[in-house]
From Swiss-Prot:
Keyword terms, alphabetized: Developmental protein, DNA-binding, Homeobox, Nucleus
Gene behind this protein: ceh-5
PROSITE patterns listed in its UniProt record: HOMEOBOX_1, HOMEOBOX_2
GO cellular component, one term: nucleus
Location of the DNA-binding region in this protein: 35-94
Single annotated GO MF: RNA polymerase II cis-regulatory region sequence-specific DNA binding
Protein name in UniProt: Homeobox protein ceh-5
Annotated source species: Caenorhabditis elegans
Localization terms from the record: Nucleus
Source taxonomy: Eukaryota, Metazoa, Ecdysozoa, Nematoda, Chromadorea
One Pfam assignment: Homeodomain
Amino acid sequence: MPSADTEFIRVIRIKSANGSEKMLEIPAKLDLERPKRPRTVFTDEQLEKLEESFNTSGYLSGSTRAKLAESLGLSDNQVKVWFQNRRTKQKKIDSRDPIKPETLKPAENYQNVYQNYQNYWTAAAFLSNNVISS
């Protein structure tokens, strides 16, 4: 078993309801007490240009991303992560609203199809199409 002070920063002993004891070892790579990197706060102008670029294309090539990052005074990584997050947000929005205007278009012809369907199943249609044989 690795030593707790070399490879692990914290060892926690947990006692379960049935009385058994378990040891939790948290690796140094998961140092939960280290300070987090401050969150990037985008200006309104940056957000406007990022949204505009996203609406043009949800994906950017490396060179386009680098140019956009430079023009906005951001790092390439900040733009990349913003686009990843924005695509995720868009997928969430799309999944919440499954009825879109383009999915309603086929319904425009529904009335004509329904009338033909009704006409087909009338007694006259049965007789004229020899559907019912005597």
